[in-house]
Regions:
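Tubulin/FtsZ superfamily GTPase core signature
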Residues: 1-311
Length: 311
């Protein structure tokens, strides 16, 4: 297997999510199971076994001539060459209706670190709004992996419109001595929250909508971005949710002061958001960011929230 894409052009979404390498693939598998409204999922890897075991229907094996399907051996240069070997396949997949793509990868290994910047550059060169969501390694994974991650982040930063960097190492600081699988699971949840939060601003019809052009204006060539999410219910739920969002523990440097653009998506459940709550959220964020920041704000219903509100 080298190339399996099941996307009829008339049914393809304008938003694609591509998981690159082992870490990116695991994250996108998780996203796929959790569900993100109105996006198409892809997985891209040198490792044929990882592709075979993934539930994602759209799979691109890269670098088969180079690695014979055995992975990149933690060598980013192999990952880069593998992506270049199959760049036409990647471009062909992205050419189906795509206006926005999320590229997720774990930085520090071979395929994700090396291939993700190549794929991102191809997407951006096609005029697609390109958003990178990447993780940095745990310190215990070793200095060499951390160094590779640093260089990988510098490379992908040059190839995307917007980059979100999620620190795996902060998981241990915040949550303590977790089982390994649970620690990586927390990171997958944050990746999912980031992609879902941005994509569903566009794809879910709400009481107040943010359209694709608003998102494009906010994120085109915006550099490093940050994101947070909060959920609360009961008294003062709106302010507690927005404060949680601004203190999201797994995103580095989550300060919005001086930001030029803010995308704000608030959702409510059975208890509809009031005008005062909507105003509280947006006015608080405007004050935190500064009066020069442009806010694009959406509001929608989510039947899973009960009496809660999310920001």
């Amino acid at each position: 297997m080298s190339f399996t894409v099941e996307l009829p052009k008339d049914k393809s979404s304008i938003i694609k999510v591509i998981g690159v390498g082992g870490g990116g693939g695991n994250a996108v598998n998780h996203m796929y199971r959790e569900g993100i409204e109105g996006v198409d999922f892809f997985i891209c890897n040198t490792d044929a076994q990882a592709l075979e075991s993934s539930p994602i229907p759209n799979k691109i094996q890269i670098g088969n001539a180079l690695t014979a399907g055995r992975g990149a051996g933690s060598n980013p240069e192999v990952g880069r060459k593998a992506a270049e070997e199959n760049i036409k396949d990647i471009i062909e997949s992205l050419g189906v209706n795509t206006q926005m793509v999320f590229i997720t990868a774990g930085m520090g290994g071979g395929t994700g670190t090396g291939a993700a910047p190549v794929i991102a550059k191809a997407a951006k060169d096609m005029g697609i709004l390109t958003v990178g969501i990447v993780t940095t390694p745990f310190i215990f994974e070793g200095g060499r992996r951390c160094d590779a991650a640093f260089h990988g982040i510098e490379e992908i930063r040059e190839s995307v419109d917007s980059l979100l960097v999620i620190s795996n190492d902060r998981i241990k600081e915040i949550y303590g001595n977790l089982p390994i699988s649970k620690a990586f699971g927390y990171a997958d949840n944050v990746l999912t929250t980031a992609a879902k939060g941005i994509a569903e601003i566009i794809t879910i019809a709400g009481s107040i909508n943010v359209d694709f052009e608003d998102v494009k204006t906010a994120m085109s060539d915006s550099g490093v971005s940050i994101m947070g999410m909060g959920l609360s219910e009961g008294d003062d739920r709106a302010m507690r949710a927005v404060n949680q969002a601004l203190n999201s523990p797994l995103l580095d440097d989550n300060k919005i002061q001086g930001a030029s653009n803010l995308l704000v998506n608030s959702s409510y459940g059975d208890e509809e958001a009031t005008m005062d709550e909507y105003a509280q959220i947006n006015e608080f964020l405007q004050n935190e960011a500064g009066r020069d920041a442009t806010l694009k704000c959406g509001l929608c219903y989510d039947d899973k929230l009960g009496n809660g509100i999310t920001v």
